Swiss-Prot record:
This is 6-phospho-beta-galactosidase. One of its GO terms (molecular function) is beta-glucosidase activity. GO terms for cellular component: cytosol. It comes from Streptococcus pyogenes serotype M6 (strain ATCC BAA-946 / MGAS10394). It catalyses: a 6-phospho-beta-D-galactoside + H2O = D-galactose 6-phosphate + an alcohol. Its EC number is 3.2.1.85. The keyword Protein biosynthesis does not apply. Keywords: Glycosidase, Hydrolase. It is an enzyme of class 3 (hydrolase). Belongs to the glycosyl hydrolase 1 family. Transmembrane segments: none annotated. The lineage of its organism: Bacteria, Bacillati, Bacillota, Bacilli, Lactobacillales. GO terms for biological process: lactose catabolic process via tagatose-6-phosphate. The active site is at E160, E375. SUPFAM superfamilies: (Trans)glycosidases.
Length: 468
């Protein structure tokens, strides 16, 4: 049976400032930790990225032509405050006014994120969100943006608090490149959630028009053997690290007893302690019912086996299938069923996981109000032929995920839109320029854009709301 989506559904494309803009030092932009970190550790940098800083009119014109009626954009904090605080950079402010005006001219609704992995270097080197002073700097930055950019109707505080803590302090693939420090992971999650809560409360108390929410990456976690209680426990603990701790903070305003029992077990095995203060919970509680929407970024699921050996995580950054490894002492190890497909980067393709995650949010956090799927897509080493890419694998991936969204809506959840990652090809934080996701192919040498086969398919779905 052919499935459909609602008439008012947003068919969007997603971007992020650092991955798309380029122009990393242009017009007074301050440095971010990634600038030096990529130079020192990877085979690519954020120059030129997709040159969105200059070419956004082209991308927005393409969006209009191809039925994309929403775009996720992030503001580069260091374009507004080059050192994260103090003097405002007027050229940065002017740039985003121009960008948002172009969005509205092209009838593409901007969903604007304040922080997408790019804390200004001055604050990052001073502890990033482990340093509570930076909570204040973030709230001040948020307040300036709310006041200044009144043309924005949809605000997101943070993109993927989970993967930030994970990338910075567990896997170590994000600056500062620390590995296996689970106390820092949870503290980063917590402090960022307090920052989110305070910004949301400020937005509502100040009476700004528009909506505000947060974007969480929610990879679904399953036990490898559902009949083995140790595997079930491993999946629960892994879910706490990546999902439940953050969702509790967002919608309960506290951490449930079950969540804290899991956190305490993880820290008992791996060391470290948390600084959770009474005023933090006052802030979390005050914001828990104020979120207008939840953004869910979903790419993959994981299956977990019990594991008590030594922690070891190997990140597959170059698309060498089977080279990744993930095992955490006292938590578990990832072990996928043999029949579940994977990408070259070992990302598991499992649309059912998105359905299960949406239904989980509805069941566990009934005050969620509404959901946007704010990122979903397939990274590929695209082959450019005949001035396009015949990306049938990507079409199939997106189609199957749209179908389970349709199912979730039929089953009583309020899902209002979908943003494909990514609108055009951008560079990937820890995989470089080889891993492409876009609807529009970017020749990074010439910065020319070419619609892929998926763009024509997506246009038809957006026009008809019929998934076929």
């Amino acid at each position: 049976m052919t499935k459909t989506l609602p008439k008012d559904f947003i068919f969007g494309g997603a971007t992020a400032a650092y991955q798309a803009e380029g122009a990393t030092h242009t017009d007074g932009k301050g440095p971010v930790a990634w600038d030096k970190y990529l130079e020192d550790n990877y085979w690519y940098t954020a120059e030129p990225a997709s040159d969105f800083y200059n070419r956004y009119p082209v991308d927005l014109k393409l969006s209009e032509e191809f039925g994309v009626n929403g775009i996720r954009i992030s503001i580069a904090w260091s374009r507004i405050f080059p050192t994260g605080k103090g003097e405002v950079n007027p050229k940065g402010v002017e740039y985003y006014h121009n960008l948002f005006a172009e969005c509205h001219k092209r009838h593409v609704e901007p969903f604007v994120t304040l922080h997408h992995f790019d804390t200004p270097e001055a604050l990052h080197s001073n502890g990033d969100f482990l340093n509570r002073e930076n909570i204040e700097h973030f709230v001040n930055y948020a307040e300036l943006c709310f006041k200044e950019f009144s043309e924005v109707n949809y605000w997101t505080t943070f993109n993927e608090i989970g993967p930030i803590g994970d990338g910075q302090y567990l896997v170590g693939k994000f600056p500062p490149g620390i590995q296996y420090d689970l106390a820092k992971v949870f503290q980063s999650h917590h402090n960022m959630m307090v920052s989110h809560a305070r910004a949301v409360k400020l937005f509502k108390d100040s009476g700004y028009s528009g909506e505000i929410g947060v974007v969480h990456a929610l990879p679904t976690k399953y036990p490898f053997d559902a009949n083995n209680p140790d595997d079930v426990r491993a999946a629960e603990l892994e879910d706490i690290i990546h999902n439940k701790f953050i969702l509790d903070a967002t919608y309960l305003g506290k951490y449930s007893d079950k969540t804290m029992e899991g956190v305490n077990h993880i820290l008992e095995v791996n060391g470290g302690e948390l600084d959770l203060r009474e005023e933090d919970f006052v802030a979390l509680d005050a914001a828990k019912d104020l979120n207008d929407f939840l953004g869910i970024n979903y790419y993959m699921s994981d299956w977990m086996q019990a594991f008590d050996g030594e922690t070891e995580i190997i990140h597959n950054g170059k698309g060498e299938k089977g080279s990744s490894k993930y095992q955490i002492k006292g938590v578990g190890r990832r072990k996928a069923p043999v029949d579940v497909p994977k990408t070259d980067w070992d990302w598991i393709i499992f649309p059912q996981g998105l359905y299960d995650q949406i239904m989980r949010v509805k069941a566990d956090y009934p005050n969620y109000k509404k959901i946007y799927i704010t990122e979903n897509g397939l990274g590929y080493k695209d082959e450019f032929v005949d001035n396009t890419v015949y990306d049938d694998g990507r079409i199939d991936y997106v189609k199957k995920h749209l179908e389970v969204i349709s199912d979730a809506i039929s089953d009583g959840t309020n899902v209002k839109g979908y943003f494909m990652w990514s609108l055009m090809d951008v560079f990937s934080w820890s995989n470089g320029y080889e891993k492409r996701y876009g609807l529009f192919y970017v020749d990074f040498e010439t910065q020319e854009r070419y619609p892929k086969k998926s763009a024509y398919w997506y246009k038809k779905v957006a026009e008809t709301q019929v998934i076929e």
